[in-house]
């Protein structure tokens, strides 16, 4: 590393090569280059707007910065590790292009407020992209729900069959988890979209800058009212990684169900060849690698959140070099969430097929209608707890006899309690069990159809 550092005139000796490499961030903060250029263009225009530099100089700066953007997009600008970070790399290249005027760009600005601006612009953009991905994920869930209102699936508690539900109802649960994710990111976007530009190193600047003008150019909704907070705040990054962790929780839960449902033991879905892999030694295998990877990557995002929390907990005001470590955690968190949302959306849209015959068989081969027998008696005046205890005994007796509730004769029902009539068979039929749960938010078919309309409205309104 022989390049002269921007700050090196303060020092008599040169930086040890290993320390220079250790100190550099260009290998990962190059991710911010587009946002760094955008922020610098706004800063240059503000400097001219306030008379700190001339309009001609500002135009030279903007032209040079746009040239760097074009060079980067065309693969012609690839700063090496000797450049230390993306900010110095851009400034050095700008000076090469337009001469000494390029050295005026950093007037009234520190790397501290510069990187804070860059990372907010980056995250604002990424949040918008992720929210768009969430909408695509929700749409696929909604498409499946519309096709499976009256398809029944066992509902579980403690991973034991509990009550049958509409498959659409089950899928819409994930739709609403995703809706909360979408809304949560929108709230975080507001707190991210505040400009620290003009905070300087920590205390502001002596130049007559207009922070609100540059914020307006960058479409920020406001400016930090405290310069110390402006350069040292990373709440928005922590909030994002928290929201990202919740997105991953929801994707991981769905992934776990996909893994179970695709197993021979459940056999509720079939994985298509486009979204499954095989074994290197067992030729019969079709492995659910996509949901397994999503489930595995969830811990990775959790780790980034915890790492950033621990990073921040002991930092005094204002900027500290520790904050260089925020970027890799944030960048990888963003990349992981985007990749998992894309993979799950593809898996749902073209990677699975529901085995409706198997699902029908599943809801007809257990005692998940037992609660409805108790409800049947309670509706006819029998105290629910008494009815509950009675049905528990019936289930125990039926299990011992190798029978299901639907196999009992009417005489056997009446022996259990005289309130039973011939309509008990209809009451415990799986389709009726589901249809009868017509309370708001329940799995009844009428409620599910209304829930689908509500979900459509949510997607159309944003």
From Swiss-Prot:
GO terms for molecular function: argininosuccinate lyase activity. It is an enzyme of class 4 (lyase). Keywords: Amino-acid biosynthesis, Arginine biosynthesis, Cytoplasm, Lyase. Its EC number is 4.3.2.1. Pathway: Amino-acid biosynthesis; L-arginine biosynthesis; L-arginine from L-ornithine and carbamoyl phosphate: step 3/3. It catalyses: 2-(N(omega)-L-arginino)succinate = fumarate + L-arginine. One of its GO terms (cellular component) is cytosol. GO terms for biological process: arginine biosynthetic process via ornithine; L-arginine biosynthetic process. It comes from the Bacteria. Gene3D superfamilies: Fumarase/aspartase (C-terminal domain), Fumarase/aspartase (Central domain), Fumarase/aspartase (N-terminal domain). It is found in: Cytoplasm. InterPro entries: Arg_succ_lyase_C, Argininosuccinate_lyase, Fumarase/histidase_N, Fumarate_lyase_CS, Fumarate_lyase_fam, Fumarate_lyase_N, L-Aspartase-like. Belongs to the lyase 1 family. Argininosuccinate lyase subfamily. HAMAP family: Arg_succ_lyase. This is Argininosuccinate lyase.
């Amino acid at each position: 590393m022989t390049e002269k550092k921007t700050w090196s005139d303060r020092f008599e000796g040169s930086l040890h090569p290993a320390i220079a490499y250790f100190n550099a961030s260009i290998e990962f903060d190059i991710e911010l280059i587009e946002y760094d250029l955008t922020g610098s263009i706004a800063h240059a225009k503000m400097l001219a707007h306030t008379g700190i530099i001339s309009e001609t100089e500002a135009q030279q700066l903007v032209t040079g910065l746009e040239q760097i953007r074009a060079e980067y997009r065309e693969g012609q600008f690839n700063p090496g590790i000797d450049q230390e970070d993306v900010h110095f790399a851009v400034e050095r290249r700008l000076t090469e292009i337009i001469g000494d005027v390029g050295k005026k760009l950093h007037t009234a600005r520190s790397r501290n407020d510069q990187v804070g601006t860059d990372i907010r612009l980056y995250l604002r953009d990424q949040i918008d992209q992720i929210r768009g991905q969430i909408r695509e994920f929700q749409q696929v869930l909604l498409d499946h729900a519309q096709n499976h209102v009256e398809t029944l699936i066992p509902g579980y508690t403690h991973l034991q069959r509990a009550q049958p539900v509409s498959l659409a109802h089950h899928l819409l649960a994930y739709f609403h988890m995703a809706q909360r994710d979408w809304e949560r990111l929108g709230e975080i976007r507001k707190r991210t979209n505040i400009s620290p530009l003009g905070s300087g190193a920590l205390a502001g600047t002596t130049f007559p800058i207009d922070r609100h003008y540059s914020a307006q150019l960058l479409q920020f909704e406001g400016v930090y009212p405290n310069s110390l907070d402006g350069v040292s705040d990373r709440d928005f990054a922590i909030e994002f990684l928290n929201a990202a962790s919740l997105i991953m929780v929801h994707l991981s839960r769905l992934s776990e169900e996909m893994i179970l449902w695709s197993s021979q033991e459940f056999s509720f879905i079939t994985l298509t060849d486009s979204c499954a892999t095989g074994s290197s030694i067992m030729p019969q295998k079709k492995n659910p690698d996509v949901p397994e990877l999503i489930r595995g990557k969830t811990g990775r995002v959790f780790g980034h959140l915890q790492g950033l929390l621990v990073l921040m907990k002991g930092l005094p005001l204002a900027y500290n070099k520790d904050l260089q470590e925020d970027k890799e955690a944030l960048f990888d968190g963003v990349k992981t969430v985007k990749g998992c949302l894309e993979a799950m959306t593809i898996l749902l849209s073209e990677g699975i097929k529901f085995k409706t015959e198997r699902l029908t068989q599943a809801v007809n081969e257990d005692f998940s209608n037992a609660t409805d027998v108790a409800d049947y008696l309670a509706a006819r005046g029998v105290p629910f707890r008494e009815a509950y205890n009675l049905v528990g005994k019936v289930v125990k007796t039926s299990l011992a006899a190798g029978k299901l509730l639907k196999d009992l004769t009417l005489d056997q029902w009446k022996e259990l309690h005289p309130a039973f009539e011939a309509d008990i068979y209809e009451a415990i039929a799986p389709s009726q069990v589901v249809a009868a749960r017509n309370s708001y938010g329940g799995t009844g078919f009428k409620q599910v159809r209304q829930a689908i309309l509500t979900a459509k409205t949510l997607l159309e309104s944003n």
